[in-house]
Amino acid sequence: MVRVKNVKMYKKRSLQLIRLAIELAKNNNIELARMYIKLALLYSRKLKFKIPIEYKRLFCRKCFTPLIIGITERRRIKNKVLVRTCLYCGWTRRYKLQYKTTNKKSKS
């Protein structure tokens, strides 16, 4: 029972650290933001819980820099692929863009 409480507490703290790291990066304190993200990942590895994907996509996997468009990240769309590039280490990640198609034919 104690371990379950600890995991919930540390998961909440990890997500809070990632959000705080984003705010620090916006205020040009990149090194402290990196340390916060490393600490959040350390918690998740140590206590074996997963960080949600929307938080995982907020930082570079190679140098742990929070990714902020125009400051630490460059985004380009090429051939229906979103390319995200970290401006500190050059790490790139590609996401396939899926457009929703609408059927304009109405049944008469």
From Swiss-Prot:
Cofactor dependency: Zn(2+)
Principal subcellular localization: cytoplasm
An example molecular function term from Gene Ontology annotations: ribonuclease P activity
Residues that, per the record, bind Zn(2+): C60, C63, C86, C89
Subcellular location: Cytoplasm
GO biological process: tRNA 5'-leader removal
Catalytic activity: Endonucleolytic cleavage of RNA, removing 5'-extranucleotides from tRNA precursor
Cofactor, how bound (note): Binds 1 zinc ion per subunit.
Biological role: Part of ribonuclease P, a protein complex that generates mature tRNA molecules by cleaving their 5'-ends.
Subunit structure: Consists of a catalytic RNA component and at least 4-5 protein subunits.
Listed name of the protein: Ribonuclease P protein component 4
